[in-house]
């Protein structure tokens, strides 16, 4: 069979022009590509409410965690004072009145285990008020134990009670299950404090990415990967925006941030509060991991930067270009390029190297703004020019990707093309090529 679409020669598509866009929306990162199986692992989630110009959060430190009831209920308290990191200051103090009492995690609607595969559990704990006994880690399904490990507890004396110890256990799945329950319990009565409880499949790619989803992305052979968004770059408010510098370094020092999509579709009818109100970002996939993902799937990285604007659909907030704070946004752009490409003795290149990648990532382009457009009150074009000047003063080789707004049929779209001085090929003009 011969299929002829047209006998007119069209414009060739440049190699690398077809790629992927990744954003933590619909649990694409936390609960998705990020292989972490525990939800709210640092006891730092918040519950999100509100509407345009009036967003707010309430503490939900214990979201996803509950006491088990098989041996009577222990007591869960969420406290602060001497955490493993001041960035995420809350942690769990669990008291068992009787042996076998414990707590379980929601785990993004349940643990999935595949028979024969192994999973590594890590957590920080301290046990100054747990003079004897150990810690049991399990995954259960309908009362059946599907994977289990015993962890020997370090019984620290009272004078060293502030010292956190890192524990590790390997679980081997005895059967394949869905919607399993992750539990931790104490073998004796006592009090133990926990923080940063993690469970990862041992086949996670680079120890970060869920293998099945990673393989699907790689199989698409994308020319580029645009990340980390999307509207989460902008945030519902500038306080909620994505700050790339908070997404690099040690996992325990990455500040949990509520997800912009946690307040999507709020309305008076639902009390400005939806079923996704606890959607938070752990930043377990941060900018280092995004660059690493690009390298592993053979795609060019295309990071997108905030230009001092919160989401134009969801907020009126901005930083004026003549305010000193605007320089922070420009500096973040310049520093990002140093993080990706800079030598190991540079400020941000050294951060990359310490994370395990002394070689540069080979960044060649950055996105200036997400779905921004020009208005009477917002001079996006002026912001673009400010970023262009700041970036090209130090890195003239970097290509910049602008924004033409969120649609292709409006005046704001046409104005953007006029600004970028690009030739707009209409369908009629394309026929003549």
Model-derived features with residue positions:
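Extracellular and organelle-lumenal recognition/adhesion modules and their flexible linkers in secreted
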Residues: 1-282, 300, 318-327, 377-378, ...
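Alpha-helical scaffolding within the catalytic cores
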Residues: 3-5, 76, 208-212, 285-289, ...
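Active-site beta-loop-alpha junctions enriched in small/polar residues
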Residues: 23-25, 229-232, 306-308, 368-371, ...
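Acidic, His- and aromatic-enriched active-site or binding-groove loops in soluble protein domains
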Residues: 294, 320-342
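Acidic-and-aromatic substrate-binding clefts and catalytic sites of carbohydrate-active enzymes
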Residues: 205-206, 280-281, 311, 344-347, ...
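Aromatic-lined carbohydrate-recognition surfaces of secreted/lumenal glycan-active proteins
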Residues: 352-353, 392-411
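Conserved small/polar residues in nucleotide/adenosyl-binding loops
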Residues: 425-432
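Active-site groove signature of glycoside hydrolases
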Residues: 229, 312, 344-377
């Amino acid at each position: 069979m011969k299929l002829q679409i047209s006998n007119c020669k069209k414009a060739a598509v440049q190699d690398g022009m077809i790629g992927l866009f990744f954003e933590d929306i619909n649990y694409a990162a936390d609960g998705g590509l990020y292989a972490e199986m525990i939800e709210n692992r640092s006891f730092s989630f918040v519950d999100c409410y509100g509407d345009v110009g009036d967003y707010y959060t309430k503490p939900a430190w214990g979201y996803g965690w509950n006491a088990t009831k098989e041996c009577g209920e222990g007591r869960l308290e969420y406290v602060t004072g001497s955490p493993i990191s001041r960035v995420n200051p809350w942690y769990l103090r669990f008291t068992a009145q009787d042996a076998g009492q414990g707590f379980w995690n929601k785990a993004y609607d349940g643990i999935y285990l595949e028979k024969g595969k192994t999973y590594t559990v890590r957590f920080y704990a301290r046990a100054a008020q747990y003079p004897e006994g150990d810690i049991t880690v399990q995954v259960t399904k309908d009362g059946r134990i599907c994977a289990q490990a015993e962890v020997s507890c370090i019984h620290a004396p009272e004078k060293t009670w502030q010292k956190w110890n890192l524990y590790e256990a390997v679980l081997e799945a005895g059967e394949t299950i869905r919607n399993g329950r992750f539990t931790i319990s104490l073998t004796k009565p006592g009090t133990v404090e926990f923080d940063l409880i993690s469970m990862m499949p041992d086949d996670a790619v680079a120890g970060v990415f869920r293998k099945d989803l990673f393989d699907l992305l790689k199989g698409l052979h994308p020319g580029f990967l645009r990340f980390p968004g999307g509207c989460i770059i902008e945030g519902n408010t500038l306080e909620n925006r994505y700050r790339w510098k908070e997404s690099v370094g040690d996992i325990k020092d990455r500040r949990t941030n509520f997800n912009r999509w946690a307040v999507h579709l709020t309305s008076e009818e639902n009390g400005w509060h939806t079923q996704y109100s606890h959607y938070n970002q752990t930043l377990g996939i941060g900018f280092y991991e995004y660059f690493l993902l690009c390298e592993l799937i053979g795609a060019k990285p295309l990071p997108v930067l905030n230009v001092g604007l919160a989401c134009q659909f969801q907020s009126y907030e901005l930083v004026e270009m003549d305010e000193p704070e605007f320089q922070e946004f420009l500096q973040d752009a310049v520093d990002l390029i140093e993080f990706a490409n800079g030598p190991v003795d540079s400020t941000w290149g050294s951060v990359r190297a310490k994370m395990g990648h002394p070689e540069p990532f080979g960044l060649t382009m950055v996105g200036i703004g997400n779905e921004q457009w020009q208005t009477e009150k917002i001079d996006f074009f002026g912001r673009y020019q400010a970023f262009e000047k700041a970036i090209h003063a130090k890195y003239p080789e970097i290509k910049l990707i602008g924004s033409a707004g969120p649609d292709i049929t409006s005046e704001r779209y046409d104005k953007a093309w006029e600004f970028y001085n690009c030739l707009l090929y209409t369908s009629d003009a394309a026929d003549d090529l």
